[in-house]
Amino acid sequence: MSGHNKWSTIKHKKGAADAKRGKVFTKIIKEITVAAKLGGGDPNGNPRLRSAVDKAKAENMPKDNIERAIKKGTGELEGVNYEEIVYEGYGPGGVAVLVECMTDNRNRTVGDVRSTFTKCNGNMGETGCVSWMFDKKGLIVVSKDADFEKLFEVALEAGAEDVADEEEQYEVLTDPSSFMEVREALEKAGFAHESAEITMIPQTMVKLDGKNAENMLKLMDRLEDNDDVQNVYANFDISMEEMEKLM
């Protein structure tokens, strides 16, 4: 499990996700709007929109909010025009960090992101400085209650690249182009997923502890707390014990 996934899991267990539900809703609504704008308003024909709608349902977002966000994206309702930008930089200990943003004010966002890096002993870099250290993949997370051998067989037959047996869950990795096909095959075979998304997987990990670990978690928390930031990917590895102590 990547450092970011561990961090998200612990945050969810401790209820931090619930405390920030308003921010979570804001980010999902932006993603639904942009996905509908780029690929149309039908989730069945738009994988990005389907993933965003699934996230909204998992967070118990009211159906009206979802439909309104889709209509803003397709132009049926008036909405804000968001620009997608990715910022890159380094966290404490040389950790590679990718920050995906959706903003209606590029100047505000770049200033906020740069300031956050600096305050947490990191620094923002040039475009391309760390993106080569990540691979774009489909990631489908399945509960440990599932039969691993059957999951492995169904996933690979549908075109998955790998199925990993992690500490808390099974993780099915796919190429982005086969993500929807694998996901649908798993659903048909009765495997309910805990999450399914296109994400950035780090090629190598940087082990952190002590002050560097503490500052890295602060950086993640502050970046994700920014309304303009949609996703943060980083290649840090902090032990579960240390992470639980620091959070």
From Swiss-Prot:
Coiled-coil ranges (or none): none
GO terms (BP aspect): regulation of DNA-templated transcription
Single GO cellular component term: cytosol
Subcellular location: Cytoplasm
NCBIfam families (UniProt xref): PRK00110.1 (NF001030), PRK12378.1 (NF009044), YebC/PmpR family DNA-binding transcriptional regulator (TIGR01033)
Family designation: Belongs to the TACO1 family.
Name of this chain's protein: Probable transcriptional regulatory protein Gmet_0743
Lineage summary: Bacteria, Pseudomonadati, Thermodesulfobacteriota, Desulfuromonadia, Geobacterales
